[in-house]
A protein has these predicted regions:
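Hydrophobic alpha-helical transmembrane segments of multi-pass inner-membrane transport and secretion
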Residues: 23-26
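Ferredoxin-type iron-sulfur electron-transfer modules in oxidoreductases and energy-metabolism complexes
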Residues: 1-21, 37-138
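Structured, non-catalytic alpha/beta "coupling" segments that mediate domain-domain communication
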Residues: 28-31, 35
């Protein structure tokens, strides 16, 4: 994780593109995840609406992994089952942890599994989130 944190954004993107070159898109990471709730209706396999293609491209693989990481943001406990299940050894937990850390920073330090009463940040909706200042975006 420290190595990824020390990289520039273009370096991180190159790293993940290289990892996605090796991805088989077998969904072992998704299937092994105890927090994933979309096994029965996953965007990667949905035909209505048609969110993703079955194209074997780095773009589509990175798209799936990013969507999956965002779906888990705020819920991933860091157990590492996704990474252990990967037949080609992609360090996918690092992507989930990076996105989880960004969510934690945006949503007042939320950590998955610490408070059973807390609602994961991306499962709720506020018209204006406290730490996201959309009106200032240009």
């Amino acid at each position: 994780m420290a190595l990824l944190d020390s990289m520039t954004l273009p370096e991180r993107m190159a790293f993940w593109r290289g990892q996605m070159e090796r991805c088989l898109r077998c969904y072992a990471c998704r299937n092994a995840c105890p927090m994933c709730v979309c096994r029965d209706y996953c965007v990667a396999e949905s035909r209505d609406p048609h969110w993703m293609t079955q194209e074997d491209s780095v773009r589509e693989k990175l798209y799936f992994q990013t969507i999956h990481a965002l779906h888990l943001a705020g819920r991933c406990t860091g157990c590492g089952e996704c990474q252990r299940a990967c037949p080609v050894g992609i360090p996918i937990l690092a992507l989930r942890q990076q996105i989880g850390r960004a969510v934690s920073q945006l949503f007042d330090g939320y950590k998955a599994g610490m408070d059973p009463e807390a609602v994961p940040p991306l499962l709720g909706y506020e018209l204006e989130e406290k730490n996201i200042h959309e009106r200032e975006w240009k």
